A protein has these predicted regions:
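Long, charge-rich alpha-helical interaction segments
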Residues: 226-228, 232-265
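Conserved small/polar residues in nucleotide/adenosyl-binding loops
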Residues: 298-305
Length: 305
C-alpha cells in the first residue's frame, strides 16, 4: 500500500497540516487511507498478548473496580472469561512483530524517522475504552475495523485533576469540544496535552501511531550519563587563584560560578550532543523484540466464545 503524503490529509495537504495543526490542534481526516483493511486479525492480536516478550494490557470499564487494569502476558483462557462488552486490549509495538503493520510507517515519513515511537493496536468490545485522558506526545489514531466514537476535550497539564485510580491516569473532568465516529480508513490526529476519549460502538480495532517526545528530564539524565562515560577521571573541579574565604563553612558564589562554567562547557559540546542524540533516538523501544520475532509463534485464541 503506497499513497502520497498529501493524500493522507485530503484537501489540507501535508504542508498545511504541519504549519497549522502539528502540535497545535486536533484534525479529523475522513478516509485518510481509503479502503483500509486491518493488517492483523483480532485473534492474532490476542495471541500476541499471551507472549512474554510483548507489552500488553486489558482495561475493563467495570472490573473488580472501575477502570481495572490487567497486565500481560495473559493465560490462554483469558478471553473466554471476559464479559461480552466494556473492555479493551492494547498491544504495544505491534510494528516490531508484524511486517505488514510496520509498512504503515512509510505513510508518515513526512516527519523525521527518529520521531516515530511505535504502533500500538487496541481491540475493543462495544463500550470499551481506556477512559478520558491526555498524552504528552503526538498520536495519529487510524481506525482499522469497526466503529469508535471519539470525543475531544480541553488542553490539559500535570495540574489537571484525575480520578483516584491506582494504575491509570483518567481525567476527572472532561470538557467535550468535538465528537466524531470513526470508520475504517478514517484518522484522527491528537496533539500533546489534548484530552480525548474513545469508546467502541462496535467490536473495533484502532491503530495508534505515536511519536517520541523525550522529556527534558530524560534528555538531561541520558546525555549527562553519556558525557560522564566519556570523561577522564583526571578532569576535575579546579580553583587556581582562589581567594581566602571569609567563611570556611560557606560555598561562596565564585565556586558556584566556576562549577557552572564547567557544566556549561561540557553540555555545550554540540558534536557530543549530536552523537548521543542519534544513538538515543534511533534505539529500538524494545530491542529484545528483534530477536524474539524470529522465533515467535502466533497463538490464536478466540477473544470470546
Amino acid at each position: 500500500m503506497t499513497i502520497e503524503f498529501d493524500s493522507l490529509f485530503g484537501d489540507i495537504g501535508v504542508d498545511r497540516f504541519l504549519a497549522e495543526y502539528w502540535q497545535r490542534k486536533p484534525l479529523l481526516i475522513r478516509q485518510a487511507i481509503p479502503g483500509f483493511e486491518s493488517q492483523i486479525e483480532t485473534n492474532e492480536l490476542a495471541g500476541l498478548s499471551l507472549e512474554e516478550e510483548v507489552e500488553s494490557r486489558i482495561i475493563l470499564k467495570e472490573g473488580s473496580h472501575p477502570w481495572e487494569l490487567r497486565q500481560g502476558p495473559f493465560p490462554d483462557d483469558t478471553y473466554q472469561q471476559l464479559p461480552e462488552r466494556d473492555w479493551t486490549l492494547l498491544v504495544q509495538a505491534v510494528d516490531q512483530f508484524v511486517p505488514e503493520v510496520a509498512d504503515l510507517l512509510a505513510q508518515f515519513r513526512f516527519l523525521p524517522s527518529w520521531r516515530v515511537d511505535d504502533i500500538m493496536i487496541s481491540y475493543a468490545t462495544p463500550g470499551g475504552g481506556v477512559g478520558p485522558h491526555y498524552d504528552n506526545y503526538d498520536v495519529f489514531l487510524l481506525q482499522g475495523h469497526g466503529k469508535r466514537r471519539w470525543r475531544i476535550g480541553q488542553q490539559c497539564s500535570e495540574d489537571s485533576p484525575l480520578l483516584e485510580n491506582p494504575d491509570l491516569r483518567i481525567l476527572a473532568e472532561f470538557d467535550c469540544q468535538d465528537e466524531w465516529v470513526l470508520e475504517p480508513g478514517d484518522m484522527l490526529y491528537i496533539p500533546p496535552g489534548v484530552a480525548h476519549d474513545g469508546v467502541a460502538e462496535t467490536d473495533c480495532m484502532t491503530y495508534s501511531i505515536g511519536f517520541r517526545a523525550p522529556s527534558h528530564a530524560e534528555i538531561l539524565v541520558h546525555f549527562t550519563d553519556y558525557l560522564a562515560h566519556h570523561l577522564s577521571d583526571d578532569q576535575r573541579y579546579g580553583d587556581a587563584g582562589v581567594n581566602r574565604p571569609s567563611d570556611p563553612a560557606a560555598i561562596d558564589p565564585a565556586a558556584i560560578d566556576r562549577l557552572q562554567q564547567s557544566v556549561l562547557r561540557l553540555v555545550s559540546d554540540k558534536e557530543a550532543l549530536a552523537t548521543w542524540f542519534g544513538r538515543h533516538m534511533t534505539e529500538a523501544k524494545y530491542p529484545e523484540l528483534a530477536q524474539a520475532y524470529a522465533c515467535l509463534l502466533y497463538t490464536s485464541p478466540s477473544p470470546r466464545d
